[in-house]
Every structure is written in structure tokens, then in C-alpha cells.
């Protein structure tokens, strides 16, 4: 029976299994599967767009012994920032690679409701503890 099912279905099932320890909210998983993955906010000052990974392309990573998921492929003007999911507190964090600054950003629902505000606030240092 398995041989008759589409391979993508099993790849997705395998990805879900791999990401189980990250405790991703269902809404976040669904968003990364359906998009839009390119977020645009032309009225913002610093960052006018960002591109998220699709669910199948989300990157597992470790930073200072913390297991995290990288959710953002790239964003406008700033290549040294990563948008990360932390399973520990079930929140988005960001990492400024150049300055080695790691700060909490928002819960997924808050972020996706106004991503331009959060990404620009991140650049301006609004969320630094």
C-alpha cells in the first residue's frame, strides 16, 4: 500500500517526525506549508520584505548548545540576522550573527499578524533584553 502513495507524502511525514521535538504550533506548520512565504511590507523603514523557508526546507541548527529551527531564508538589506524557533519557550527568537546577539522576538501568532513591525523592530534593537 505504501508503494502506491505519493513519495512527497512520506517525505512530509518524515519531516514532521524529525521536527516533533521542536513543538511547532500547528498554525506555524500550516503557514510554512501553504504560504505566502514572501512577506512584504513596503511602508516599513529598514526591512521591506522577508522570505520564509517552506516547511520541507526549514533548517535545524544549534547555537551555543541550543537546538533551534531557522525559519527565514533571507530578508531585505540584512543578511546577518536569523529568525529562529525555540522549542524551549515556544517563541520566535532572532540571532544577529555579526554581534552574536540572541533575543526573544514574539509568539508565532503575534509575529505573522505584523511581521514588518517585528523585523524592523529587531533591526532597531527594540527587542533586546
Descriptions of predicted regions:
Residues 86-89:
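Short acidic-glycine loop/turn motifs at beta-strand connectors
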Residues 79-81, 91-94:
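Substrate-binding/catalytic groove segments of enzymes
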Residues 1-83, 126-127:
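A surface-exposed partner-binding patch
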Amino acid at each position: 500500500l505504501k508503494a502506491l502513495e505519493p513519495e512527497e507524502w512520506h517525505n512530509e511525514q518524515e519531516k514532521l517526525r524529525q521536527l516533533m521535538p521542536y513543538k511547532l504550533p500547528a498554525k506555524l506548520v500550516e503557514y510554512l506549508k501553504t504560504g505566502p512565504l514572501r512577506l512584504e511590507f513596503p511602508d516599513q523603514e529598514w526591512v521591506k520584505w522577508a522570505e520564509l523557508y517552506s516547511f520541507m526546507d526549514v533548517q535545524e541548527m544549534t547555537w551555543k548548545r541550543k537546538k533551534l529551527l531557522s525559519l527565514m531564508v533571507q530578508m531585505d538589506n540584512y543578511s546577518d540576522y536569523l529568525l529562529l524557533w525555540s522549542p524551549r519557550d515556544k517563541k520566535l527568537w532572532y540571532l544577529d550573527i555579526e554581534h552574536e546577539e540572541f533575543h526573544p522576538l514574539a509568539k508565532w501568532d503575534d509575529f505573522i499578524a505584523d511581521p514588518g513591525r517585528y523585523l524592523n523592530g529587531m533591526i532597531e534593537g527594540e527587542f533586546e533584553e
